[in-house]
Amino acid sequence: MDNLFEIDETKRLRREEAAARLRDLADVLARNNEVEFERDGGRITVHVPDEVNLKIEVELGGDEQELEIELTW
């Protein structure tokens, strides 16, 4: 059986703060093939290949709108 590690975090931020976090992540991805995440005193390093699949999903309707950005490989 494969071990699954997952971080699922939801925070309410100002739009500018969310953009800054996305920008920081984009900068790290542009410079390195690794991204580090910290959670509950632990740290995980994700190795990202040179080519990835980018999925952008928009859901409109109802009370909640959604823009989802996903990288897979």
Give a label for each model feature.
Residues 6-8, 63:
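Predominantly single-stranded RNA-binding modules in RNA-associated proteins
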Residues 9, 33-55:
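Short, structured protein-protein interaction patches enriched in aromatics and acidic/basic residues
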